[in-house]
């Protein structure tokens, strides 16, 4: 049976019969042990490797063949060791270390098969990447195609496992050989042989990441044959590699990142209606985030309720998604209710949970509640990000109470010292302006000095703030001098830019 399948792969002119659609999981080979080698060198090498102690086998092996082994000889020796894949790998590394074999795709393929059939995934993948590098020296043939053909030709003799083709596709993806991975998938699929679902998902994800969500979606349709036949027939044809939630989650995330939130909804409908796949909590989270990003909170809340009806357990990501969406859309009261619900269910908050609430309160003009959450956040050992701190600063500076700007300056000072916070120019200028308006010139000068130390040259707005500030406290002389300095500075800056 395996010989027939391999012939179908190697011969591009042959077309499989309609009833010959086989899963790659059926491509298994049970071969008899290799016949005794006719070359005495090979039998001697096998004997040394299998019967000598580990400390002596390598020196004895070098004495046996100082000039090294040909790739063909290496393959024959390794075939005799195929039931001991770790020894086969050590033999390979030994020949590489002492330059005892000029390995090619043929010798690498033998070892790849032996490692694959023993599920030594990482080692097999490493040898596949080496084979791809060795194949790159041949300018007349695509290197991935060359390795693929070599694996096919040696498949039966090595008693390999279909898993080897999945490793080849994934190794191509790791090496950024997208075209090569697609080519292997197409060659297998054209003969009715399917890769594992994890391999299909990896291919779709990588195409989406490197070539855009739309191309990833096209690859999904091709991999699962959804454009070849009717939907009902496609469901039958997919068989054992029916797309799973991970497949759809990957595509939804890709479209969401590109801002195509309507496509997120389309993928969701295909998942449920066309393929009949059940979404998981991650799927719901992505859909809710897509609605929240568009401000469609009523739709997001419907998804939230659907999760409850279907018995999908909310995780921290689900809570953070809804809390963030509600806070961004001025529904901080509902967000606070979800926050309390988290506590009742024993779900630990994350830094992001608190940041959403702080930003939500500040956006709604309730900076005092934002400060309460911020202080609770710090008590629990979380450090807010820059946007959250600047939201607090803006909220405090909008309050005309003179002490609030001092509170804002203290928050920035502590954040710079404790959390490696780097205020933006706008943050510095806002503090300077409000301090000057309240006549707190010494504190404003300290902020301005720190601002210059961070590489922010005084702008016209900064000069204006100090000029007005010194005027407020009655220091007209300093105010006038700053006006002259500002004019000279702006003139010099204009000359430098021209």
Swiss-Prot record:
Gene3D superfamilies: Tetratricopeptide repeat domain
Source domain of life: Eukaryota
Keywords: Repeat
Pfam families assigned: PPR, PPR_2
PPR repeat ranges, renumbered to this chain: 244-274, 280-314, 315-349, 350-384, 385-423, 424-458, 459-489
Coiled-coil parts of chain: none
Keyword match Heme: no
InterPro entries membership: Pentatricopeptide_rpt (IPR002885), TPR-like_helical_dom_sf (IPR011990)
Family listed: Belongs to the PPR family. P subfamily.
UniProt-listed NCBIfam families: PPR
Protein name (Swiss-Prot/TrEMBL): Pentatricopeptide repeat-containing protein At2g15980
